[in-house]
Structures are given as C-alpha cells and as structure tokens.
Amino acid sequence: MPIRVPDELPAVNFLREENVFVMTTSRASGQEIRPLKVLILNLMPKKIETENQFLRLLSNSPLQVDIQLLRIDSRESRNTPAEHLNNFYCNFEDIQEQNFDGLIVTGAPLGLVEFNDVAYWPQIKQVLEWSKDHVTSTLFVCWAVQAALNILYGIPKQTRTDKLSGVYEHHILHPHALLTRGFDDSFLAPHSRYADFPAALIRDYTDLEILAETEEGDAYLFASKDKRIAFVTGHPEYDAQTLAQEYFRDVEAGLNPDVPYNYFPHNDPQNTPRASWRSHGNLLFTNWLNYYVYQITPYDLRHMNPTLD
C-alpha cells in the first residue's frame, strides 16, 4: 500500500533508499482512488525516527494510504525541530470535524509517570473520546495501550518493578483470527516498557479478545470483536538498532540497565543486533489495514456508523 505523504517529508527519501514505495501528494493527486485516511498521533520524543518506523510498515500493500500526523503537546520539543512540527503536523482543532479510516496512537516514554501527571493527559482523553465517532479502527501501541485501557475500561496503571527490554517469543491463541492471519505459531517481537499487561487482567476486566501472548503470560495482541480497537503491547515498528540506542542512552545516564534480552548476538552489547521481528511487524500492520480498516470502513467517510460504546 503506497503511503501518501507531503512531498517534503524527510521520510520520503529515507524510505525510498530502502526501496519502500512512497507516493507523494503531487503524484497521488493524479489517481482517481479514494485513499484510506490514517491519522497518526505521534507521542514519541524523536518524532522523525518514529514516523519512519510506522510509515515503513504502512507501505506494504497495494492501496493508497493518506497519512496525517497529529500532535497534542504544544510544549517545545527537544528532539524534533519546530519547523518540522509546524510543516507536517496538525493540531487536534484542525481535524476534529473530520473522519478517518484508521488511527494509530504510538507509545511514549511515560511508563513511570502517573496518568494525571502526564502534561497532555486531558488531550489524550479528548482524542480517544473523539475517535469513537470519527475513526473506523484505532491501533494502540505500548504505553498508549495502558492509557486506552484506563480511559476506556477504567483499569488502573499496572507497572513492572524492572523494565522489560528485549526481543521475546510470543504464541498466537487464535490461528484463524483476522489480525493474526499468516502469523507463525510462535514469533518474536521487541518490548521496551515498564507497563505491565497480565493476560488475566485483560480477560477479567474487559470484553477484549486476546490474540497473542508472551511466553510469560502477558497479553501482547488483543482487540475488540467489532474490530474498532486493537492493542499491541510491544514495539513491532522498532528498527534493528532502536533497543541498542535506548540501552546505551541509559548506560550513559548512569541507570545501569540490564542488557536487552535475546537481542545482542551472544548477549554482548559490542555486537551488532539484527532485526528478527521484521516480517511479523509488516504482517501485523498489513492485517490491521486490510481486515480492521479497509474491509469495514465506508467508502464515504461522512456515513460512518460508530459502534464503540
């Protein structure tokens, strides 16, 4: 699915170097196709890096996806140039009257911060409430899963004593579920979080269906039966080097982090890591776009039929 982005977005050249099909707005305007409209609420500090990661995964299918980047934190960013934010991001007020086929809410490094202490917590709640009537399907990633479970289901914040960091094995519970279609029975995916997601908590306090778990019994992938909301507690979008960058950052900060599990060859941080989850990440996002977005969204977004209560 060629992603449709502004001509000047840095991700265009970055992804084309990887032979990823990116369609600029100027080229897409010549095609008489109704693209899928996908809104990305990017909560990560290094926004350009996160854009590249998600856009790479959204590009792997034959239909157009029109990407809109959203920000809700008006504070000055220390990691992303203001010019980039001003040129490529919209504010909530710019899109609140629009409808979208899909919404992705990224993770954020807020695992040890109480919800009410998050500077933009009211805006997070506003976007999630808005999405019930304006978005066909929403995908929450890592910290956003924890936030959504609290807002939508009233589940208190669950925090691990130690950070979960590394590449872990998972197994699917429903091999014929649409979101896991084509998955191997067991697959690898990276995690980097303090948030805790015991599968029993999801089963006992929500009506969500768990589709994949970690070997330790944590919920990894779960969704509502009507496909309106889906949750992934790991980071299938991560590059091969992302966990390494986080590890060495924490080492330099004197935090004495554990070496990410099952990541560096021979468990030696001096060795170059390789991505062992790339096919899983691509298939997950392709399935979400196809089965949770494309196949249930109306052709005319003005005729949305929200079912999420």
Swiss-Prot record:
Binding site for substrate: K163, S192, R249
GO molecular function list: homoserine O-acetyltransferase activity; homoserine O-succinyltransferase activity
Important for acyl-CoA specificity (site feature) positions: G111
Pathway(s) of this molecule: Amino-acid biosynthesis; L-methionine biosynthesis via de novo pathway; O-succinyl-L-homoserine from L-homoserine: step 1/1
Residues at the site labelled Important for substrate specificity: S192
Domain of life: Bacteria
One Pfam family linked to the record: HTS
CDD domains, sorted: GATase1_HTS
GO cellular component, one term: cytoplasm
Subcellular location: Cytoplasm
Catalytic reaction list: L-homoserine + succinyl-CoA = O-succinyl-L-homoserine + CoA
Main location: cytoplasm
Record carries keyword Hydrolase: no
Catalytic residues (UniProt): C142 (acyl-thioester intermediate), H235 (proton acceptor), E237
E.C. numbers: 2.3.1.46
InterPro entries named in the record: Class_I_gatase-like (IPR029062), HST_MetA (IPR005697), MetA_family (IPR033752)
One annotated GO biological process: L-methionine biosynthetic process from homoserine via O-succinyl-L-homoserine and cystathionine
Keyword list, A-Z: Acyltransferase, Amino-acid biosynthesis, Cytoplasm, Methionine biosynthesis, Transferase
Quaternary state and interactors: Homodimer.
Family: Belongs to the MetA family.
Function in brief: Transfers a succinyl group from succinyl-CoA to L-homoserine, forming succinyl-L-homoserine.
Listed name of the protein: Homoserine O-succinyltransferase
Organism: Escherichia fergusonii (strain ATCC 35469 / DSM 13698 / CCUG 18766 / IAM 14443 / JCM 21226 / LMG 7866 / NBRC 102419 / NCTC 12128 / CDC 0568-73)
